[in-house]
Amino acid sequence: MHIGKKNYPNLITSFRMNLKKIILNHDRFSHPERWKTNALLRFTFVYIKFLFDLMIIKNPLRMVGKTYRDAVTALNSLQSNYANIMAIRQTGDRKNTMTLLEMHEWSRRIGYSASDFNKLNIVHITGTKGKGSTAAFTSSILGQYKEQLPRIGLYTSPHLKSVRERIRINGEPISEEKFAKYFFEVWDRLDSTTSSLDKFPHMIPGSKPGYFKFLTLLSFHTFIQEDCKSCVYEVGVGGELDSTNIIEKPIVCGVTLLGIDHTFMLGDTIEEIAWNKGGIFKSGAPAFTVEKQPPQGLTILKERAEERKTTLTEVPSFKQLENVKLGIAGEFQKSNASLAVMLASEILHTSNILEEKIKCSSNASIPEKFIIGLQNTKWEGRCQVLEKGKNVWYIDGAHTKDSMVAASTWFRDTVRLSKRKKILLFNQQSRDANALVNNLYSSVSPEITFDDVIFTTNVTWKSGSYSADLVSMNTSQEDVEKLKVQESLVKNWNKIDDNRAKTHVTASIEEANELIETLYDEPADIFVTGSLHLVGGLLVVFDRIDVK
């Protein structure tokens, strides 16, 4: 293979992934104390450092430029691939107790301590369903107070079309130029510093934090450099050991509806999941949660709040919001909007912008600016309606049981009286896809029957390539190429639907879109769901068509 500059990113990606595989499969790395007592192991990694330096791949990206595309390529090299994820799962160890210690160390290496992040006046939000929507609502409300809060940061995940969506200021993704600038400032600081291998055996020279951890560090750096006056942070997974939990003094914490998800990492009961979510609670920072939480989960959340010496308050749905058209559709969003009202109220009161906090009562009076903020909230891929040509697309990236029921119910109620043809476009590559389809089917039936059902992969283009921002290494490439999940979904659908709908399989989202355009001369209602990756890929395909 010719090793030119263009091959460096691929070279370093391959090297790091194989190195990670060694680490993940080596028992001693799960136990730092064994590292200290094993001279051979330590010598091995000193030698690896030597190879890093000798091969000049410690930071080859300095040699190929620092554009946005370079940043995305480098960022994608930090993803855990499917084999590594499976290796971790096989160990049965859910907890990486080093996560937060490592986050503190990574932060030190880029020039910050956790206390530096306190100046961001953070709202910290966790939950299973609706935490992204709640974060968006909260950010939009705060954005109505521009004179007092000229810059509001928003950190969410995952993204739909562009990784820049994860780091927003005043509701807008940061520019490609700023993303690249701040990305390489963090990247280069990590390259120019080292950590003690006695304390942090995983942090060998040349290594970087994983994809989400790196973005979390990048968000802190960006928001501080941009002088954001308040920031809204959505937890990645769980709370207790999430990399965002390096936040020491949030102003307020929120918990959206709990459900069963990410069971490998969080546990497979509501109690275990609630315990993890409650890990973001901090002394002195009041916590709020939506009403109608599962009773067992609510009990644990209350215990966690008491543990952390703070208060937990259930937020009712405000009556004043009953007739408000929220910027994010779906009746279930009313509870998320109500939670956002209380979170924003705490920030604004603490900042001496609101004289009095909003009362946590269903009859409370909500300021007009709050209402405008809720109405103006924009959040693609969640109960989104798009008219494209003759067809109407109903798009929601639901990928858990509860969110699938909510999204399917929204679609059913919205198109119940429509006489158009009905088409389903679905994929879920890493969870129990058939179970989600069953949830969908039972939620729309018998009122809605689909004429055509299309199961696709999350591959963006019919050439077999992905949009660079949508590259994902955490699914089995073999399963994608052989359409294993999609063929299984067809069998399951035909069984539950008694072969009424015509089923199709496509190898890419672009092909699925082309198929839909040719199915009928008459208009159709198209429900797209199952995966945020699917939704993001479809929106990217739409963008290219619109440009043409």
UniProtKB/Swiss-Prot annotation:
Mg(2+) 2 binds at residue 262. It is an enzyme of class 6 (ligase). It catalyses: (6S)-5,6,7,8-tetrahydrofolyl-(gamma-L-Glu)(n) + L-glutamate + ATP = (6S)-5,6,7,8-tetrahydrofolyl-(gamma-L-Glu)(n+1) + ADP + phosphate + H(+). ATP binds at residues 130-133, 382, 396. GO terms for molecular function: ATP binding; metal ion binding; tetrahydrofolylpolyglutamate synthase activity. Mg(2+) 1 binds at residues 157, 234. The keyword S-adenosyl-L-methionine does not apply. GO terms for cellular component: cytosol; mitochondrial inner membrane; mitochondrial matrix. It is found in: Mitochondrion inner membrane; Mitochondrion matrix; Cytoplasm. One of its GO terms (biological process) is one-carbon metabolic process. The keyword Ribosomal protein does not apply. SUPFAM superfamilies: MurD-like peptide ligases, catalytic domain, MurD-like peptide ligases, peptide-binding domain. Keywords: ATP-binding, Cytoplasm, Ligase, Magnesium, Membrane, Metal-binding, Mitochondrion, Mitochondrion inner membrane, Nucleotide-binding, One-carbon metabolism. Its cofactor is a monovalent cation. Pathway: Cofactor biosynthesis; tetrahydrofolylpolyglutamate biosynthesis. A monovalent cation. Its EC number is 6.3.2.17. Belongs to the folylpolyglutamate synthase family. NCBIfam families: folC (TIGR01499). Catalyzes conversion of folates to polyglutamate derivatives allowing concentration of folate compounds in the cell and the intracellular retention of these cofactors, which are important substrates for most of the folate-dependent enzymes that are involved in one-carbon transfer reactions involved in purine, pyrimidine and amino acid synthesis. Required for methionine synthesis and maintenance of intact mitochondrial DNA. Involved in telomere maintenance. This is Folylpolyglutamate synthase. The gene is MET7.
